[in-house]
């Protein structure tokens, strides 16, 4: 029976899965938008959202906990100096998953994962003043 077994295995070993989500979470923190498959995006929420909640209160202990989960100094710095203060008043739901069609090679459903209140960068072309 499958009672109370949460999480997906993705046909990977536990170390590979842990490494994959560690890398994806660090990329999400650094770029604030990544493209991945829908099941990986849904599973990434379980890794990334607690990190942002941790970053809302800046302390040495919280930074060390975040570093133990991300293993990227740049990502931890950005998480605590930019992203944590941005979501100070939001009680959760920091990520948005936008479906974006199928991957050409194997028709896997793809999605963008983005931070909810990320700053929008204007395109530099076609600016007429």
Swiss-Prot record:
Keywords assigned by UniProt, alphabetized: Ribonucleoprotein, Ribosomal protein
SS bond partners: none
Xref: Pfam families: Ribosomal_L17
GO molecular function: structural constituent of ribosome
Taxonomic superkingdom: Bacteria
GO cellular component: cytosolic large ribosomal subunit
Biological processes annotated in GO: translation
Assembly and binders: Part of the 50S ribosomal subunit. Contacts protein L32.
Protein family per UniProt: Belongs to the bacterial ribosomal protein bL17 family.
Name this protein carries in UniProt: Large ribosomal subunit protein bL17
Protein's organism: Hahella chejuensis (strain KCTC 2396)
């Amino acid at each position: 029976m499958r009672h109370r077994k949460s999480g997906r295995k993705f046909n990977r070993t536990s170390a590979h899965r842990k490494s994959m989500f560690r890398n994806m979470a660090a990329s999400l923190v650094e770029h604030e938008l990544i493209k991945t498959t829908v099941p990986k995006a849904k599973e990434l929420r379980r890794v990334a959202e607690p990190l942002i909640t941790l970053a809302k209160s800046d302390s040495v202990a919280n930074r060390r906990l975040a570093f133990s989960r991300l293993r990227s100094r740049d990502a931890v710095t950005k998480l605590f100096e930019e992203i944590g203060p941005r979501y100070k008043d939001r009680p959760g739901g920091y990520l948005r998953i936008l479906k974006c069609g199928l991957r050409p090679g194997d028709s896997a459903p793809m999605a963008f994962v983005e931070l909810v209140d990320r700053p929008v960068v204007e395109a530099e072309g076609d600016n007429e003043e």
